[in-house]
Structures are given as structure tokens and as C-alpha cells.
């Protein structure tokens, strides 16, 4: 079942918190700490290794939170289709698949029997042109991102994961009705760490992002809930005030 239409998000659902923790106990602490400031959570590989991944997924759903399963599936089409078929039984809003192979994305969309929205990972925000060249791809990241976004669109995916630096180019290439979710968001007071292609909240939405993923800028804040609320305010301003 192709779910090509983008996920309809409320303004406060456009800030996705990266729940990168090693245990269910810590996950529950963060859910409680952030309260109503966060309505959408991304759960990834570190939590999967704890063996408590699906308990946390249920915990989030029970709290009325949206869930983003970020496991970046990349395998032969039949295997990825099987995983998506099983995940369709869970209350998942977003799920990621690597955007490197069109038949794999096609198989995933055909196996999706729920309202789960599939996002293609284009080029990780930790990667530069030099990193791509080492992999035999001697091209600018934006060119690779656009190529993979177009392939994802053709395969029936709901959208892509991409840096805010490439969001405007994706929107021009693919048009509306296709979700662009941007990680690598950084504020002035937070180091970039391993992120290379970063962007501010306001700039990401100005470039056409539908949602952003934020982890360390919230986790490292003196008051994480207040930091998240400040980001919610910035998002609301970016989406409601006319650009100059």
C-alpha cells in the first residue's frame, strides 16, 4: 500500500526529539522530563540494542506521542519488505529506509499495510563531499540528495531525511506533497559534534522543511524542557510569520 501523501503534522509535532538513550528507564525519564514540550519522538539503534525497543514504542504510544522508528533499513528488497510488513502492525508515524536502492524502496512501499509513512535517508548529515568521494561518489552532496529524493518519490515513499541545506533544492525538484525531515539542527550555543551539514531551525523551515529532528541541543541544555519550548516558539514563528 503506497502512502505517498505526507504525514499531516500539527505545529507542535514538527519538533522531533531524538531519544538516543541506552535503556527504557532513561527513555521514560526523558519522556517525563520533557512533558508536553515534545509530542514526537525518534527511537533508533542504541535503544534497539537494549532489547527494550518495542516496550518504549508502546510507552510512547500510550502517552499519546507520535513515534519515528529510525533504523535505516538497507537490505535486499524481500528482506526490507518483510520488516515493513511486520512494523505495519505497530503505531508508527515515520520509519526510515536507506534511499540508495529504488527496488528496495518500491518493495517497502508495497509491503506497507498501515498509515506508517516511509522516509528515505538520502545522505547522512555527518557526511561531506570528501566522505562521498571515499565511497566512489565524486559528487556534491546536494546532487546525490536530489537524485535519491526523486527516486524515493518515484517509488512511492512519503518523503526523505535530508539536511536543511538541501531542503530547498529537494522542494524545487519534487514539489509539494512530499515530506522533508531535517536532522543536523544546531543552535548558536551547541557544538556541531559529528554533524557537518547543519542549519538553524528558522533557516530549515524557510528552506521547506516539514519537521526537524533535534537531540543534543535539547539533551545538553541546562533546562531541556525550556529549550524544547523555545524551539517550539521558533518553529511557530517560522511557520506563521511571512518571510522577508
Swiss-Prot record:
Q: Which organism is it from?
A: Xylella fastidiosa (strain 9a5c)
Query: Which residues bind substrate per the record?
Result: 20, 42, 70-79, 125, 186, 195, 215-216
Oligomeric and partner information: Homodimer.
- Gene name, Swiss-Prot/TrEMBL: pyrF
From the UniProt record, give the pathway where this protein acts: Pyrimidine metabolism; UMP biosynthesis via de novo pathway; UMP from orotate: step 2/2
| Broadest EC class assigned to this enzyme | lyase
What are its GO cellular component terms? Answer: cytosol
Sorted alphabetically, which PANTHER family does this protein's record hold?
OROTIDINE 5'-PHOSPHATE DECARBOXYLASE
Task: Outline what the protein does.
Answer: Catalyzes the decarboxylation of orotidine 5'-monophosphate (OMP) to uridine 5'-monophosphate (UMP).
Q: Which reaction does it catalyse?
A: orotidine 5'-phosphate + H(+) = UMP + CO2
Which InterPro entries does the record cross-reference, listed alphabetically?
A: Aldolase_TIM, OMPdecase, OMPdecase_AS, OMPdecase_bac, OMPdeCOase_dom, RibuloseP-bd_barrel
Cited NCBIfam families: PRK00230.1, pyrF
UniProt key word Coiled coil? no
Q: Identify the keywords attached in UniProt to this record, alphabetized.
A: Decarboxylase, Lyase, Pyrimidine biosynthesis
The protein's name is: Orotidine 5'-phosphate decarboxylase
| EC id | 4.1.1.23
Supply the SMART domains for this chain: OMPdecase
Q: Tell me which stretches of the chain form a coiled coil.
A: none
**Pfam families assigned:** OMPdecase
Q: Please report which protein family the annotation says this sequence is part of.
A: Belongs to the OMP decarboxylase family. Type 1 subfamily.
The cross-references to Gene3D superfamilies, in alphabetical order and at most eight, read: Aldolase class I
Claim: Lipoprotein is one of the keywords in the record: no
Q: According to its UniProt record, which residues of this chain constitute the active site?
A: 72
Amino acid at each position: 500500500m503506497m502512502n505517498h501523501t505526507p504525514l499531516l503534522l500539527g505545529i507542535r509535532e514538527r519538533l522531533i526529539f531524538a531519544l538516543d538513550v541506552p535503556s527504557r528507564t532513561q527513555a521514560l525519564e526523558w519522556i517525563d522530563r520533557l512533558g508536553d514540550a515534545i509530542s514526537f519522538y525518534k527511537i533508533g539503534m542504541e535503544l534497539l540494542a537494549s532489547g527494550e525497543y518495542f516496550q518504549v514504542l508502546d510507552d510512547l504510544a500510550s502517552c499519546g506521542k507520535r513515534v519515528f522508528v529510525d533504523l535505516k533499513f538497507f537490505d535486499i528488497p524481500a528482506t526490507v519488505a518483510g520488516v515493513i510488513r511486520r512494523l505495519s502492525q505497530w503505531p508508527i508515524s515515520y520509519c526510515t529506509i536507506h534511499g540508495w536502492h529504488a527496488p528496495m524502496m518500491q518493495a517497502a512501499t508495497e509491503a506497507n499495510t498501515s498509515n506508517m509513512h516511509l522516509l528515505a535517508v538520502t545522505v547522512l548529515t555527518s557526511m561531506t563531499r570528501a566522505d562521498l568521494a571515499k565511497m566512489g561518489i565524486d559528487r556534491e552532496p546536494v546532487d546525490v540528495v536530489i537524485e535519491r529524493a526523486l527516486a524515493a518519490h518515484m517509488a512511492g515513499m512519503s518523503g526523505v531525511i535530508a539536511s536543511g541545506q538541501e531542503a530547498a533544492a529537494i522542494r524545487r525538484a519534487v514539489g509539494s506533497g512530499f515530506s522533508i525531515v531535517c536532522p543536523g539542527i544546531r543552535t548558536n550555543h551547541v557544538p556541531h559534534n559529528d554533524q557537518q551539514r547543519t542549519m538553524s531551525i528558522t533557516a530549515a523551515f524557510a528552506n521547506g522543511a516539514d519537521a526537524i529532528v533535534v537531540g543534543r541541543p535539547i539533551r545538553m541544555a541546562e533546562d531541556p524542557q525550556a529549550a524544547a519550548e523555545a524551539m517550539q516558539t521558533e518553529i511557530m514563528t517560522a511557520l506563521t510569520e511571512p518571510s522577508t
